[in-house]
Amino acid sequence: MSTASVMDLVRDDLRAFAGYASARTSALQGDVWLNANESAWGNPADPDASTRRYPDPQPKGLRAALAQLYGCAPEQLLIGRGSDEAIDLLVRGLCVPERDAVVVTPPVFGMYAVCARLQNAPLVEVPLVDGADGLHADVPAIVQAALDAKAKLVFLCSPSNPAGSAIPLAEIEAALQALQGKAVVVVDEAYGEFSDVPSAIGLLARYDNLAVLRTLSKAHALAAARIGSLIANAELIALLRRCQAPYPVPTPCAVMAEQALSAPALAVTQRRVTEIRAERARLHAALVQVAGVRQVYPSQGNFLLVRFDDAEAAFQALLEAGVVVRDQRAVPRLSDALRITIGTPDQNDRVLGALQRKQEAA
């Protein structure tokens, strides 16, 4: 598909949109900077005055490091405030209110629907299928729903939150082929580091209607830094960058993130991912033996979705043990479920101990 075709999916009124040109976007040179109305002095809380100036909108060093990490070109990557900002930019950039639909696969991460509703974009739901192999996406049904609704965006969460299932790469490619020139397929790989399924990023060379979301919040343990990446066609990235707020990446967060992508830090992250995967298998095997546990779904993420005979009792037993998990009971089709993040071995033992004591006391 030609580069122009993905841009045909962008809102007509935004294709020539220039956005806001901040003081940091100009390529001027000097040693006295008086162009952004910043303070000439640092704050007492900032002894080296490193935060008195506005940050680079897309820090070059961090952008290059993220591109290397994910295997794309820097111009194909946009840094944002977590994946949430990227989701919002995609919906606002592609969807005309009351016309262009967004396809989601509940139960799934709620921000896709939130952003669609804020844009007043029609929301099309294609529920996950609850089968013997877990809750999984019905990709042919998703594609058909997108075609029927003339959707502009299709969100595929892989691994899915909270279901834990991943979509095979061949099925993602089939969706991209079927929706070429019709919709952008957004693959949310927030939990990709924990998965056996390869990243969809490699498909970008053949399909410019692909967008991939990645984050440093999960495997890289930088949730508070809010460093998310949108990886997509370079022309689409340039357009969405013009739609983005002027200074999305605070300097302290960018510095920390770049340090986290050094070789020694990445080696630590990989060791922890390996440990989490091992603990995920151990906790899964142990939970299925606990009385009152109805089902433990297989997971490609750093969490397990668990159904209980009495989810309220399980939730309260964990709280009494000082363990806070995600209550899923208000989510349609998950009225008996809790989502449990994989913690340290000791933390996972506390989960098991609390649930086992609950059953012994029953």
Curated annotation (Swiss-Prot):
Biological pathway: Amino-acid biosynthesis; L-histidine biosynthesis; L-histidine from 5-phospho-alpha-D-ribose 1-diphosphate: step 7/9
- Keyword Cell inner membrane found: no
Please give the Gene Ontology molecular function terms for this protein.
histidinol-phosphate transaminase activity; pyridoxal phosphate binding
What EC number(s) are associated with this protein in UniProt? 2.6.1.9
What's the cofactor?
pyridoxal 5'-phosphate
Q: Which UniProt keywords apply?
A: Amino-acid biosynthesis, Aminotransferase, Histidine biosynthesis, Pyridoxal phosphate, Transferase
Protein name in UniProt: Histidinol-phosphate aminotransferase
The UniProt gene name for this protein comes to hisC
